[in-house]
């Protein structure tokens, strides 16, 4: 008689995804980041739930309620630090996961990839509205600057901004609705994650050499369950070390000052994980261009599968495109650095060059390199 895990209507779904799932035998640690993202999401939802029990979404008490959590609630300081730094780890894992997808050609699973890009946008939205909640100076001014970009939408821009604000400026109504969105969005992310996995399990995982691995599959459990558990241990250790030893390392000191609409901070900037997009945004002098560049800096990922020209899937045996991939990584680091710098020479021109290179790599240089590599293969 077949075991319960193979016959029970609910358990057999989990069994198919976590126990008997056929997985390529040669997938490296770069394939760990998917499960790490699941762990990050669960950690963020749990810590966020406990924070929401003590937080008040009113401009007169929001800042002091966060201070109250850190000072008076049992282990509130730990929950808050884990949640704030957990967001940083979430984005580290996302960027690693996307980089793995780009390097090994996982984007050729188009449905899985496109749902992943939507997931990235949703997580970015969640992080943005979450950053507003402590109601510090950078929370307030960050919300003001970014929401104001919608005024560039033709005809209905100003109306759209006031609709999102719930008034004529970022105020109590804005904070209340941002809290509602920040509570709701992670559950939408969780639902989309299930869809992401559903489409992934239609095709199975890609692997480092980019060839069909049907002839050499192993079961997910115990091989990859234990491999994932090791990843969990490493990430949780790193997260707790950051949250316990230097919890404010990645934050902005400006956010320890309560929001004041009458005093503008000398340098408005988002959290480190948005700095690359912020640098692209700032490199364009036109407001509508800024909105389009900001959106396209992420949506360009959706175009990648359409621009795949190479006969090979991954970059394992493609040195020219490998060089371009690492150029992209370096470019992202430069953009992140520029996003945190003041708007003055030479940072303006460096940001503009890095922004042009960012889009050129995706839209022109990588497709050209793939075509060139096909030609060199014919000569060999």
Curated annotation (Swiss-Prot):
Chain positions recorded as heme b b562 binding sites: 83, 182
Binding positions (a ubiquinone): 201
Cofactor(s) demanded: heme b
Cofactor: binding details: Binds 2 heme b groups non-covalently.
Location of the protein in the cell: Mitochondrion inner membrane
GO CC list: mitochondrial inner membrane; respiratory chain complex III
Transmembrane segments annotated in the record for this chain: 33-53, 77-98, 113-133, 178-198, 226-246, 288-308, 320-340, 347-367
InterPro entries per the UniProt record, alphabetical: Cyt_b/b6_C, Cyt_b/b6_C_sf, Cyt_b/b6_N, Cytb/b6-like_sf, Cytochrome_b, Cytochrome_b_C_euk/bac, Cytochrome_b_N_euk/bac, Di-haem_cyt_TM
Membrane topology: Multi-pass membrane protein
GO MF term list: metal ion binding; ubiquinol-cytochrome-c reductase activity
Residues holding heme b b566: 97, 196
Keywords of this entry: Electron transport, Heme, Iron, Membrane, Metal-binding, Mitochondrion, Mitochondrion inner membrane, Respiratory chain, Transmembrane, Transmembrane helix, Transport, Ubiquinone
Biological processes annotated in GO: mitochondrial electron transport, ubiquinol to cytochrome c
Job of this protein: Component of the ubiquinol-cytochrome c reductase complex (complex III or cytochrome b-c1 complex) that is part of the mitochondrial respiratory chain. The b-c1 complex mediates electron transfer from ubiquinol to cytochrome c. Contributes to the generation of a proton gradient across the mitochondrial membrane that is then used for ATP synthesis.
Other facts: Heme 1 (or BL or b562) is low-potential and absorbs at about 562 nm, and heme 2 (or BH or b566) is high-potential and absorbs at about 566 nm.
Family in the record: Belongs to the cytochrome b family.
Subunit structure: The cytochrome bc1 complex contains 3 respiratory subunits (MT-CYB, CYC1 and UQCRFS1), 2 core proteins (UQCRC1 and UQCRC2) and probably 6 low-molecular weight proteins.
UniProt name for this protein: Cytochrome b
Gene name tied to this protein: mt-cyb
């Amino acid at each position: 008689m077949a075991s319960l895990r193979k016959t029970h209507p609910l358990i057999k779904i989990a069994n198919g995804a976590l126990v008997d799932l056929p997985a390529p035998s040669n997938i490296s640690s770069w394939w760990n980041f998917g499960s790490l993202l699941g762990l990050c999401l669960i950690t963020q939802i749990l810590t966020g739930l406990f924070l929401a029990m003590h937080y008040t979404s009113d401009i007169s008490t929001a800042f002091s309620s966060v201070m109250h959590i850190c000072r008076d609630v049992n282990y509130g300081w730990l929950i808050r630090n884990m949640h704030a730094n957990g967001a940083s780890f979430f984005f580290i894992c996302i960027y690693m996961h996307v980089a793995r997808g780009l390097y090994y050609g996982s984007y050729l699973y188009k449905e899985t990839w496109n749902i992943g890009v939507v997931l990235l946008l949703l997580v970015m939205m969640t992080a943005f509205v979450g950053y507003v909640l402590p109601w510090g100076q950078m929370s307030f001014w960050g919300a003001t600057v970014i929401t104001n970009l919608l005024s560039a939408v033709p005809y209905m821009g100003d109306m759209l901004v006031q609709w999102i604000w719930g008034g004529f400026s970022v105020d109590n109504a804005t904070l209340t609705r941002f809290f509602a969105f920040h509570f709701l969005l992670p559950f939408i992310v969780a639902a989309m994650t299930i869809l992401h996995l559903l489409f992934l399990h239609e095709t199975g995982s890609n692997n480092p050499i980019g060839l069909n691995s049907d002839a050499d599959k192993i079961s997910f459990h115990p091989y990859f369950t234990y491999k994932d558990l090791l990843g969990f241990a490493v990430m949780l250790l790193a997260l707790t070390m950051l949250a316990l030893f230097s919890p404010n390392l990645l934050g902005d000191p400006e956010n320890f000052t309560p929001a004041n609409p009458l005093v503008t901070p000398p340098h408005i900037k988002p959290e480190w994980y948005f700095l690359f997009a912020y640098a692209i945004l700032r490199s364009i002098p036109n407001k509508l261009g800024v909105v389009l560049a900001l959106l396209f800096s992420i949506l360009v990922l959706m175009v990648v599968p359409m621009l795949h020209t190479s006969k090979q899937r991954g970059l394992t045996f493609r040195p020219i495109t490998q060089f371009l991939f690492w150029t992209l990584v370096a470019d992202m680091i430069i953009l992140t650095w520029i996003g945190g710098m003041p708007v003055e020479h030479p940072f303006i021109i460096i940001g503009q060059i890095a922004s042009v290179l960012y889009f050129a790599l995706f839209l022109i240089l990588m497709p050209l390199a793939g075509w060139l590599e096909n030609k060199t293969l014919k000569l060999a």
